[in-house]
């Protein structure tokens, strides 16, 4: 478990010790098992923060979990940062991952804005559950 300690610690952007992040984790990390709590956090981040790929702030402040929570929205990277932070606040080891992905569900407006359907630097979260890293992408709201 000592090897997982870095994946439980706060960082400048994964500000898991921030009061708002801790409160969100306490409110939403419900369930009998760690997996149940992780799924509850995933759903809360995915559906509780509106996906908005048109407001991108790459500053340190703009990339903080606490900032995305305060704004109630974010694009894939801040939403992944939030899930990583609230998981850590709930005691679930978590880390960020990035990949270039082709999004066949993107809107015409987004494809025109990006001039492609490839999402470069798509952010996701990896959660340590049941002895392995599990990928979770909370970007796109269920609705």
Q: What are the residue ranges of the model-derived segments?
A:
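Secondary-structure capping and boundary motifs in well-ordered enzyme cores
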Residues: 68, 72-75, 117
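Hydrophobic/aromatic-rich core segments of domains that either
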Residues: 43, 78-143
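Secondary-structure boundary elements
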Residues: 1-71
